[in-house]
Amino acid sequence: SQKRKELVIATKISGKGYKNVRNGKGIFPKEIRLAIEGSLKNLQTDYIDLYQLHWPNRGSYHFRQYWNYDPTSQESSVERENIELVVKELYDLKKEGKIRYIGLSNETAWGTVQFANEAKKYNDFSIASIQNEYSLLCRIFDTDLAETCFHENVKLLAYSPLVGGMITGKYLNSQVPENSRLSRVPDMFGRVTPNSTRAIGEYIELSKSFELDPVHLALSFCRSRPFMGSVIFGASNVDQLKLILKGKDIYLKDDVLAEVNKLYKKIPMPM
């Protein structure tokens, strides 16, 4: 229908280890087909615009896993074969009209290149996006992944651009508002550290010096990055959504970006 054509529906197949989803099975051709059929039924649609692979079977360094990340236990031939079979299945599903584009998530530079090269074997098929964490405090995408995605024409869909709401300052001074995310996840998946608390305080002061709301600074900064496709934000209520949308036309000037980079150099990788 015309109304459906106006929508862009994106969903994922969950990765290995989610015991409540497919008994924790990883991402394999059979699992992909079952998951897509389930999503089509649940979403009551004939096709999915963007279908994403949530987490590599081999694991990755995201969600603060880079502090102890060790890829040497991986078997290169096994990983390459899995990627080959997964891409073939996704291509078949595209030919069947069930998906339009494919994306990665929580992927590494090596994994992105493998998927991109495999997709090039098929006509009119490529990796459209990668959904990884990116924010004022989390900028590990800026190096190898930025270069990889530039050359492979893969756009970043940034999740947690507001650092789980931390950038607002509502958790400073050990505050834990009732029903907040921090009240449910005590360390916010490793985001709550002395350095992140210090950095957030300084970004809030930076926002004030330019008469900006820290939410607008955070989202506008992400949008300013050359590799950005879109920014995924969350809002728990209408007031939060109104505040976010109020800054949709804000574009940061060079002097603001220079101060952001200066602060990031001062407190690099704060979480």
Where are these regions (language model features)?
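Short amphipathic alpha-helices and their capping/turn segments at secondary-structure boundaries
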Residues: 1-3, 32-47, 144-153, 256
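Acidic (Asp/Glu)-rich catalytic clusters
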Residues: 1-8, 41-44, 94, 116-123
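Structural motif corresponding to the early beta-alpha repeats
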Residues: 6-29, 54-57
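Active-site mouth loops of central-metabolism enzymes
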Residues: 19-33, 73-81
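Active-site groove signature of glycoside hydrolases
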Residues: 41-64
